[in-house]
Each structure stands twice: as C-alpha cells, then as structure tokens.
Amino acid sequence: MAEQPSRQQILQTQYNSYKSRLQQIAQKIVDLETDADEHKLVMDTLNSMDNNRRCFRMIHGVLVERTVGTVVPILKTTQEGIQTAMNGLLDQYKQLEAEFQKFQKDNKIQVVRQ
C-alpha cells in the first residue's frame, strides 16, 4: 500500500508551486518590458523620419517593405497591447503574491535560509 504524503510534503509542494508560478509571471513581465523598450526605441527613431520613407518590418520571419507612415500606427497599437498585457500580468502577480503570503501566514510557514 502506498504511503500518503505527509502534511509537510504537501505544504512544501504547494509552496514550490507558488514560487514557480510567481517566477514564471515575473519572467513574462521582464520579457514584455524588453519588447516595450525595443518598440519605444523604434518608435522614437521612426517618428523623426518622413512618412513616405521606406522601411522594413519583420513579420513572422519575412522581411516586408513598408513606409514609415504605415508602420508607425501598427507599432503604436502593438506597443499599447504590450502595455495592456504587462498591466494584466502585474495585477496577476500582485494577486498571486497576496494569495501566497496568505498561504504562508495561514500555515505558519517561515522561510529558513542557510
């Protein structure tokens, strides 16, 4: 007959799960911040150029020729989408962090570091 996991093992598994999910969300936020910074850099560069000037944009691995005037609105929309996603992930992170802290408090978990 298989032995049931102890309460300590269950709590350790839940603790590790919370930590892992928090790290995953934090990594996604960092990735989106990097994308947002890159979009801002491109937007700053393109805003100082003539709208009829040719530029190239990578779409799913294909380099497509466009004009600055057609690319800037698309980049602006993408940048807003990135910001919305970041805000959603930040809210999700804060909610999960509060849930994690409640879990620690309810189960009287103290982190011991060596």
Curated annotation (Swiss-Prot):
Keywords: Chaperone. Heterohexamer of two PFD-alpha type and four PFD-beta type subunits. Belongs to the prefoldin subunit beta family. GO terms for cellular component: cytoplasm; prefoldin complex. This is Probable prefoldin subunit 2. GO terms for biological process: protein folding. It comes from the Eukaryota. GO terms for molecular function: protein folding chaperone; unfolded protein binding.
